[in-house]
From Swiss-Prot:
GO terms for cellular component: commitment complex; nucleus; spliceosomal complex; U1 snRNP; U2-type prespliceosome. Residues 146-161 have a biased composition (Polar residues). The modification Phosphoserine is found at residues 688-689. This is Pre-mRNA-processing protein prp40. InterPro entries: FF_domain (IPR002713), FF_domain_sf (IPR036517), Prp40-like (IPR039726), WW_dom (IPR001202), WW_dom_sf (IPR036020). It comes from Schizosaccharomyces pombe (strain 972 / ATCC 24843) (Fission yeast). Required for pre-spliceosome formation, which is the first step of pre-mRNA splicing. This protein is associated with snRNP U1. Its main location: nucleus. Residues 191-245, 257-313, 326-385, 403-465, 470-521, 544-601 form the FF domain.
Length: 695
């Protein structure tokens, strides 16, 4: 049985690595080993590690690629596989993904040399019994050369990330047959055992991460135990794994040390009552300079870092405590606001006065942590909430009020409709006629005082509805009147006309919509229209007669010589008969009325002049001796603070009263004698002024 590769003695430390590819045309040749090695992660993902630069990449370096792989790497299409193993191709230039193999990629696969395929196949067979990558995965990065595993087709052999990788160890010059036969040894039967022995050898010589591999070879190549692994490549991998484990152990030890020191340092700070969030470093340094936990740290920088971490923790705790206290105080304050009966428009000054008098506020110890700004903001939010509730309540009340008012209006409309059916409301009905009927009805009383339409408005709406109905159907009645050749005037027999129209309308299809009330209304309106027209004509005739009378009176007024107030109609008739105004009046009564009106105005004017002269005579000083005597007396009837009236003043007053009564009697007598019974209706009922106005 041959010895394992790591126990081979016939190999120099400076030799390179040889390719293990075998094939019909592949002769064994020695090449310079690459610094890149293929490694697998714990989840079997393959990456590449450079042992010199200690750089790791996911893509296969060009140094490890063969000619065919280099050719594929230059293509824009790259082969990948999904999580379930399904292949797809991605174009790095156009960023396009397809499930079917592109033609460009397929052509490259077809051009793959046949000899290379055979070489890959023989390479896979020679590596079947080599140790798995996982055997050294615990110690450090796995280093391996590129290889392929058998596949069902060409594309599977070169799929990126989808085919397994196996370690391609360096073969010796004697060309061992299979690695499985080399694992047997008298001392180390497995690679792991030999590796552990090499780790102990390195540890016994105090090898640390500051050593390089070249330094290790120079220092320990002659030491016993160095060749426990005969293959230089395996020793190099074991050295890298040892350094990685050394660094890991050193890091874990440092973490444990720092954790222990931090715990003891913080307990030391907590044990003192002098340490607060505002404590300075010099205070801590002076206080704990002799404490074991303080001196257990490696440097003053580490001490300061631990102190500042503890100080920051105290600050955060204080801020959180203050935040919790403010929140608790704010919650208590909001609860107090809800329990106090504030109006929606309460001012902050009024609220403050209530807070100062409320023991729930003054005795609450949490309120000292509540700032005035927070309290003001909370109060504003509470007032806004009250305002919203107040507005919503008002809107609700307004809607309810509108609903009740609408129901009241609907009920009153129903009342009017009932009265309309009972024929108590017609087109000729007046509000003063309807009011006694509805004044005690609750449907009417409920409508009083509310907004919107009043009872009178709704009554007029009903009348308007009746009027619209009347206008729609009156043409049918008018057509029947025209057919029957009936003319309605003030002397017409209304019941007879209504009966004839009703009988006539029964023969027409539209008669169902025409009621007897509608027929009566049409006939009555026609009669009222005729009466009104006749009255207008009569008033027009009277106005024309009055204008003619006034014209004649005006003509008499300007006669030369003027007519005296004592003249009679018979005396002046020959004088005025030649006037055109006299001829315009065809009635003698109207002519006499014009003359009488002129005489009456003339006498009224004379009476007014007499009254004016009497008033002037009363104040005439030259004709009244008693007035002169009284005016000669000093103070004229006012002595010793009291007023004395003269007896002559009373006699003057009686005299004027007697004269006034006599004038009134004369005017009445003259008026009676001048008035003629024939024109009494025209003169007394409609007396006109000079401008023709009735007064």
């Amino acid at each position: 049985m041959s010895a394992p590769p790591w126990q081979t003695s016939e190999y120099d430390e400076t030799e390179g690595f040889t390719s293990n590819q075998e094939g019909p045309s592949a002769a064994p040749s020695k090449t310079v080993a690459s610094d890149w090695h293929e490694v697998k992660t714990e989840d079997s993902r393959v990456y590449y590690y450079n042992s010199v630069t200690r750089k790791s990449v996911w893509e296969k370096p060009e140094e490890l690629m063969n000619d065919f792989e280099k050719k594929l790497s230059k293509l824009a299409w790259k082969e990948y596989a999904t999580a379930d193993g399904k292949k797809y191709w991605y174009n790095v230039n156009t960023r396009e993904s397809v499930w079917d193999i592109p033609d460009e990629y397929k052509a490259a696969l077809v051009d793959e040399p046949e000899q290379q395929k055979k070489a890959l196949s023989s390479k896979i067979k020679s590596n079947d019994n080599k140790p798995a990558v996982q055997s050294i995965q615990r110690h450090g990065p796995d280093v391996a050369a590129p290889s392929s595993q058998p596949a069902k087709d060409q594309s599977q052999q070169i799929s990126q990330g989808s085919h397994k990788r196996t370690i391609n160890f360096v073969q010796q010059k004697d060309k061992r047959q299979k690695r499985s036969n080399d694992y047997q040894h008298e001392n180390y039967d497995t690679y792991e055992a030999a590796e552990r022995a090499f780790f102990k050898f390195l540890d016994s010589h105090n090898v640390n991460p500051s050593w390089t591999w070249e330094q290790t070879v120079r220092e320990l190549c002659d030491a016993k135990g160095y060749y426990v692994m005969k293959d230089p490549w395996h020793r190099k991998c074991a050295f890298d794994a040892y350094i990685l484990n050394y660094l890991t152990d050193q890091s874990d030890a440092e973490k444990n040390r720092v954790t222990k020191i931090r715990k003891e340092f913080i307990e030391m700070l907590k044990s003192s009552d002098k340490i607060h969030s505002y404590t300075l470093w010099r205070t801590v340094k002076n206080e704990f300079s002799s404490h074991p936990a303080f001196n257990a740290t490696s440097s003053e920088t580490e001490q300061q870092q631990l102190f500042f971490e503890y100080k920051q923790k105290l600050l955060e705790d204080e801020k959180q405590l203050e935040k919790d206290r403010r929140k608790e105080a704010l919650d208590d304050f909001c609860s107090l606001l809800r329990n106090m009966n504030f109006e929606p428009y309460t001012r902050w000054s009024v609220a403050q006065a209530k807070f100062d008098q409320d023991p729930r506020y003054t005795r609450n110890s949490n309120m000292k942590y509540l700032s005035k700004l927070d309290a003001l903001v909370a109060f504003e939010d509470h007032v806004k909430h009250l305002e919203r509730e107040y507005i919503l309540d008002k809107q609700k009340q307004k809607k309810e009020k509108h609903r009740i008012e609408r129901k009241n209006r609907d009920a009153f409309r129903a009342l009017l409709q009932d009265l309309r059916v009972q024929k108590k409301i017609t087109l000729r009905t007046k509000w003063k006629e309807l009011y006694p009927i509805i004044k005690d009805d609750p449907r009417y009383l409920n409508l009083l005082g509310q907004s919107g339409s009043t009872p009178l408005d709704l009554f007029w709406d009903t009348i308007v509805d009746l009027e619209n109905m009347y206008r729609e159907k009156r043409n049918l009645v008018l057509d029947c009147l025209e057919v029957l050749q009936i003319s309605v005037d003030d002397t017409s027999n209304i019941p007879e006309i209504i009966a004839r129209l009703s009988e006539k309308l029964k023969d027409r299809e539209e008669s169902e919509a025409v009621t007897e009330d509608l027929i009566e209304e049409v006939v009555n309106r026609l009669r009222d229209k005729a009466i009104h027209k006749k009255a207008e004509e009569k008033r027009a005739d009277e106005r024309r007669i009055r204008r003619k009378i006034d014209n004649l009176r005006s003509a008499i007024k300007y006669l030369k010589p003027p007519i005296s107030a004592d003249a009679s109609y018979d005396e002046i008739r020959p004088l005025i008969s030649i006037l055109p105004e006299f001829a315009a009046l065809h009635s003698e009564e109207h002519r006499m009325a014009a003359f009488d009106k002129y005489i009456r105005r003339l006498r009224e004017k004379r009476e007014l002049e007499k009254q004016y002269q009497n008033r002037r005579g009363y104040y005439d000083v030259g004709k009244d001796e008693s007035y002169l005597a009284n005016s000669a007396r000093p103070h004229s009837g006012y002595e010793d603070g009291r007023l004395e009236y003269s007896a002559d003043l009373a006699s003057k007053s009686n005299r004027n009263e007697i004269n006034t009564m006599q004038d009134v009697q004369e005017n009445s007598i003259s008026h009676v004698t001048a008035t003629q019974p024939a024109v009494k209706n025209i003169v007394d009922d409609a007396e006109s002024s000079e401008e023709g106005e009735i007064r």
